[in-house]
Amino acid sequence: SPEGGADKAGHLYTSYVMTRAFTGLYQHWGDDQRSAGREALFTSLLLTGIMELGDGLSPYGVSGEDMIMNVAGSLIGYQLATRENWARRLDLRMEYRPGGRSDPFTDYEHARYLVAVKLDGLNLQERSPLRWLELHAGYYARGYDDPLQRDRRHTYVGLGVNLSRWLDRAGWAGSARLLRYYQIPGTSMRADHELSP
């Protein structure tokens, strides 16, 4: 893709977040967890489908790959919204360090997308210090927006601190929820691997 695949990761992430957000909204309106998740899945698919059709009227055109990533993100969102044991263990997040564009949803040059495995969700003993840690695996692309830079794609693995657990235990539940979707830059150690062109 013209963004090194970061735009596809962005589609997956955005549809995932939409599904999770609509699940919460529908539960707030009185639906049970399973019904709310199902309705959120269909809402996310409908909205991302409409957006993709809108792209068809623009110079971007309709992208089958975007649609696949929208479906995948919505399905992952549904799984995590309706299965507590999965949600305790996994997060999909975006790490964003503001840069040239004002829109973090299309500024792929300054974004990273990752899966976080939360060790406290693996039924560790309450006294184990490992419960405060997370394992990360992610992807990002650089240079695709700047003709003076070489295009680069990266995968990485890392170790992070479960900040949402810290905030939740400190009574900051709203902030803890936000950090299930957003990775604060500089809060993990990473081993980076550049993919061949």
Give, region by region, the residue ranges found by the protein language model.
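Hydrophobic alpha-helical membrane segments
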Residues: 1-197
